[in-house]
């Protein structure tokens, strides 16, 4: 069996999940990988990448919201269309897609079945958290960003038959968990000044902030500015007292797996993060609208009363891969059976 796996590279979560899935898939089939999106990700990825397209990328304001004007102006939609037409999808038996538009749209236009495998796909289920009606347009955009005929989603709860629990990296599963008293902060859509403005008002707290703005670590009063590094981040996460993070699925999943208290600040206008944050709140977690002095008291209350969300993330990663492949084989067998049945009916 030959499989094409399209992976979105915005953030590190899609790559981290694909890394685990592909390590299992390659033991069962031949796998080609296509990336699209930014190239400056910090997750090590050993499997060969057949092609890395520019794709589509979201841009953000300095205060943690999607910058829609910049997103529209800085993406090259003509190049995107050419890449979609040129992408080879006919050479594969199975096409998997983690929110990656090139392989998804190429499959759609060339009448090839594409199976979604992403956190975003779970938002399309009617059985998950209900969002405000004002997000109806955002859901439509989400559906057509990387269209798929069917798929599997990931979330903190199995609220539908095709929803899995999060994929947890092997490196995270092996970590020794303790509490060294510091707090980890990961808010990639905020710039350093906005983060510093709030964190320095807690002088007794040791903050480790991971930011793409730094090429080398730097100490500034009680703030340790860290570069984005997979190993450093994982070790800091395992030994922290709590985590302040955006509502990105992977960081939240890993923090919950390690039983760390989380304070969640979703990116403004980002439907997936708003959805994730809503579920975190429903599970008893703390969510604030933005990082600002206005919300200082809520941050202080969270520090004084840390709460671990009770959740079991004990799913085996190979169970996900096996379910996908078994479903695919069953659907192919059923399709052949129906074809034979139709042929025999017409013949007789």
Positions of the model-derived regions?
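Conserved nucleotide-sugar phosphate-binding/catalytic loop shared by glycosyltransferases and other
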Residues: 8-12, 27, 31-78
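Donor-nucleotide binding loops and adjacent catalytic segments primarily
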Residues: 22, 169-242, 292, 296
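Conserved nucleotide-sugar donor-binding subdomain of glycosyltransferases
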Residues: 65-94, 99-102
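A donor-sugar binding/catalytic signature common to diverse glycosyltransferases
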Residues: 95-101, 106, 116, 236-275
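Active-site proximal beta-strand in glycosyltransferases
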Residues: 109-125
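A nucleotide-sugar donor-handling region in carbohydrate enzymes
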Residues: 125-191, 210-212
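Catalytic binding pocket for nucleotide-activated donors in carbohydrate/polymer assembly enzymes
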Residues: 252, 256-307
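C-terminal amphipathic helix plus adjacent low-complexity
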Residues: 300-348
